[in-house]
């Protein structure tokens, strides 16, 4: 195994790390730093913070987010299938129909359970 073949990869990694770290270190070294109480205080639209930034979210938001990701991934699988539909034949068509039927059954189950209701 010749390690010289991996030199471009090593160079790419080092340049990538350098592009990320060099501006940070230059900013730390060259930027003027005069911290005071006003600069270190939290900023909220020009006003003092009214309350703690950590608020409790309703669990329904998380449920909707998970469902969105799930159905978004479904569409991510649909695009390549639509492009390659002529090449994959009936087996690919049938497998995608089964895949979509599983998602439809899941969607109906979620709907019947009331996961999409905001009451």
UniProtKB/Swiss-Prot annotation:
Keywords, sorted A to Z: Cell inner membrane, Cell membrane, Membrane, NAD, Quinone, Translocase, Transmembrane, Transmembrane helix, Transport, Ubiquinone
Transmembrane segments: 7-27, 63-83, 88-108
Enzyme Commission code: 7.1.1.-
Keyword Cell inner membrane: yes
GO CC aspect terms: NADH dehydrogenase complex; plasma membrane
Entry keyword annotation includes Translocase: yes
Record-linked InterPro entries: NAD(P)H_OxRDtase_bac/plastid, NADH_UbQ/plastoQ_OxRdtase_su3, NDAH_ubi_oxred_su3_sf
Subcellular location: Cell inner membrane
Domain of life: Bacteria
GO molecular function (one): quinone binding
Reaction catalyzed: a quinone + NADH + 5 H(+)(in) = a quinol + NAD(+) + 4 H(+)(out)
Subunit relationships: NDH-1 is composed of 14 different subunits. Subunits NuoA, H, J, K, L, M, N constitute the membrane sector of the complex.
HAMAP family: NDH1_NuoA
Protein family according to the UniProt entry: Belongs to the complex I subunit 3 family.
Function: NDH-1 shuttles electrons from NADH, via FMN and iron-sulfur (Fe-S) centers, to quinones in the respiratory chain. The immediate electron acceptor for the enzyme in this species is believed to be ubiquinone. Couples the redox reaction to proton translocation (for every two electrons transferred, four hydrogen ions are translocated across the cytoplasmic membrane), and thus conserves the redox energy in a proton gradient.
Name of protein: NADH-quinone oxidoreductase subunit A
Organism: Polynucleobacter necessarius subsp. necessarius (strain STIR1)
Lineage, uppermost ranks: Bacteria, Pseudomonadati, Pseudomonadota, Betaproteobacteria, Burkholderiales
């Amino acid at each position: 195994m010749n390690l010289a073949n991996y030199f471009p990869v090593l160079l790419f990694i080092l340049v990538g790390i350098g592009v990320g770290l060099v501006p940070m270190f230059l900013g730390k070294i060259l930027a003027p730093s005069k911290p005071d109480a006003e600069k270190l205080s939290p900023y909220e639209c020009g006003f003092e913070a009214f309350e703690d930034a950590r608020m409790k979210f309703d669990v329904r938001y998380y449920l909707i987010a998970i469902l969105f990701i799930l159905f978004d991934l479904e569409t991510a699988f649909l695009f390549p299938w639509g492009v390659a539909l002529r090449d994959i034949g009936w087996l690919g068509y049938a497998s995608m129909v089964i895949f979509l039927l599983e998602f439809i059954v899941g969607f109906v189950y979620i709907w019947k359970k009331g996961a999409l209701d905001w009451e």
